[in-house]
A protein has these predicted regions:
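Cys/His-rich microdomains that often coordinate metals
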Residues: 35, 52
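Flanking scaffold residues of small Cys/His-coordinated metal-binding clusters
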Residues: 22-23, 40, 59
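The −1 position to Zn-ligating cysteines in a subset of zinc-ribbon hairpins
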Residues: 11, 27, 44, 102
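Structured secondary-structure scaffolds
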Residues: 3-4, 30, 48, 54-266, ...
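N-terminal Rossmann-like or analogous alpha/beta NTP/dinucleotide-binding catalytic cores
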Residues: 1-18, 32, 173
């Protein structure tokens, strides 16, 4: 990582995108830190609470303005940023007022990656931290290079509080390096607790390890993705989670699998005969099942995980309804309708197979077990 960051910094400097200038700001002498006006608390250092003074520091800057038009078009004219509603916020707040050049080095501290051609300067957070995404893949590293194999990323997912860094600064860096951008930038909201932001001081932080031990990681993963729409905050509560797990996973999918497997075992000893006989209600279930993958693919491409899961559970609900409509236990009483009974159960098994296969992306531990139950 260190070597890659130094090479990136030098390349940007050689291309004329990085230049030496002067950084001005509020300086805290005890903390040896510069702060912006907005970072101060009551005009004082946000870390130690002491007075700050106006100070200047020699620094290197990264030119942002050459990329303003390209980034604005990227955000407003393509599907790069998801959800799209975030684009207006970024353009109005940061691009329209004019992108300021970015301070990318400091001399007031020594911990960090030194600039190779001016070692009193330490590479500041932007080029250091953001470069992790490509340094980890071996970018500009002769000994280890997986970069071409894995870059560009299909989806780069970040939280809303760091959206600006990844929607404006990171694309500008990549453009300056003549590297492809991630195909999509997905911005998610925060998980709140009963509508409040989680905070240790409030004692409302949810421990995912405790939840995982109690309900299973797959169930927690499912609940979060089912309840959280991309870009919006989601309120977590034990009551909502338990209701969702019970209604969808236990009563919905779990009940469908157990009823179907039990009937296949009871009426055919666990193996269906090959004879088939179509009947009423088949077409609607088959259409719901066969059209599902394309719908889920579309939602997944848009990073709309909540909608993808909702679509899958439409099939689960339709299959449960199909059981009530066809009443296999009634058909089983007529020995001449073995083919019809086998068809009904086959349709149910196929619906389960499709639903569980698509759900495997969300619940990778549980769904293979469900597929094993039906012999898939």
């Amino acid at each position: 990582h260190i070597e890659t960051v130094q090479k990136i910094f030098k390349e940007l400097y050689d291309k004329g995108y990085i230049y030496k200038g002067e950084y001005k700001g509020k300086y805290c002498t005890p903390c040896e830190s510069f702060w912006t006006e907005s970072q101060l608390i009551d005009g004082k250092c946000p870390e130690c609470g002491r007075e700050v003074t106006e100070a200047k520091e020699e620094a290197y800057f990264f030119k942002m303005s050459p990329f303003a038009d390209r980034i604005e078009k990227l955000l407003t004219e393509t599907d790069y940023l998801q959800p799209k509603t975030r684009a207006v916020e970024l353009v109005n707040n940061f691009i329209k007022p004019g992108l300021e050049d970015l301070c990318v080095s400091r001399t007031t501290f020594k911990w960090g990656i030194p600039v190779t051609f001016d070692e009193k300067h330490i590479v500041y957070v932007w080029i250091d931290a953001l470069s992790n995404y490509i340094s980890a893949l071996g970018y500009k590293n002769e000994k280890f290079d997986e970069f071409d194999k894995y870059w560009p990323a299909d989806v780069h997912m970040v939280a809303k509080d760091i959206m600006r860094f990844h929607a404006i600064i990171w694309p500008a860096m990549l453009m300056a390096l003549d590297l492809p951008l991630p195909k999509h930038l997905a911005v998610h909201g925060w998980i709140t607790f009963n509508g409040q932001k989680m905070s240790k001081s409030l004692g409302n932080v949810v421990d995912p390890f405790v939840l995982g031990e109690r309900y299973g990681a797959d169930a927690i993963r499912y609940h979060i993705m089912r309840e959280m729409a991309l870009g919006a905050d989601s309120s977590f509560s034990n009551e909502i989670m338990i209701n969702r797990i019970n209604s969808d996973l236990a009563n919905g999918l779990g009940n469908l699998v157990s009823r179907t497997v039990a009937m296949v075992q009871k009426y055919f000893g666990g193996t269906l005969p090959t004879e088939r006989e179509s009947g009423e209600f088949d077409d609607d279930l088959i259409e719901t099942a066969t059209s599902l993958r394309a719908k889920v693919d579309d939602f997944m491409d848009k990073t709309q995980l909540q909608n993808a899961l909702a679509e899958i559970f439409k099939l689960v609900s339709r299959a449960n309804k199909y059981i009530d409509e066809t009443a296999p236990w009634v058909i089983a009483k007529d020995e001449t309708k073995k083919a019809r009974l086998a068809t009904v159960l086959y349709n149910l098994l196929e619906a389960i197979r499709i639903a569980c296969t698509l759900l495997s992306a969300f619940m990778p531990t549980t769904m293979p077990k469900a597929l094993e139950q039906i012999g898939a």
